[in-house]
């Protein structure tokens, strides 16, 4: 019995280290919302400028938004998604359009 107690005192407790459990950060969808006033060409321009879509893809997303009320522009980390939402909303206001983006957890 003294051997075991002596071992513990000399070498400390025997502990196995578990590998760290790192979670991926949550992703967020940037959602563009339809309105009755923003011209379709402006929406296409926004999708090309801020989401780097080619004209065909931007037109496809714009038509989806027009018919369904909203559409996904992309999926990003929270910081990037928030930045893109702010950029689109600011750009729209500067050009006097009510176009808005929001984000939802993916």
UniProtKB/Swiss-Prot annotation:
Classification via InterPro entries: ClpS (IPR022935), ClpS_core (IPR003769), Ribosomal_bL12_C/ClpS-like (IPR014719)
Composition-biased stretches (Basic and acidic residues): 1-14
Pfam families: ClpS (PF02617)
One annotated GO biological process: protein catabolic process
Region of interest: Disordered: 1-21
SUPFAM superfamilies per UniProt: ClpS-like (SSF54736)
Family in the record: Belongs to the ClpS family.
Function: Involved in the modulation of the specificity of the ClpAP-mediated ATP-dependent protein degradation.
Database matches in NCBIfam families: PRK00033.1-2, PRK00033.1-5
PANTHER family, sorted: ATP-DEPENDENT CLP PROTEASE ADAPTER PROTEIN CLPS, ATP-DEPENDENT CLP PROTEASE ADAPTER PROTEIN CLPS1, CHLOROPLASTIC
Quaternary structure and interacting proteins, as annotated: Binds to the N-terminal domain of the chaperone ClpA.
Protein name: ATP-dependent Clp protease adapter protein ClpS
Organism listed in the record: Alkalilimnicola ehrlichii (strain ATCC BAA-1101 / DSM 17681 / MLHE-1)
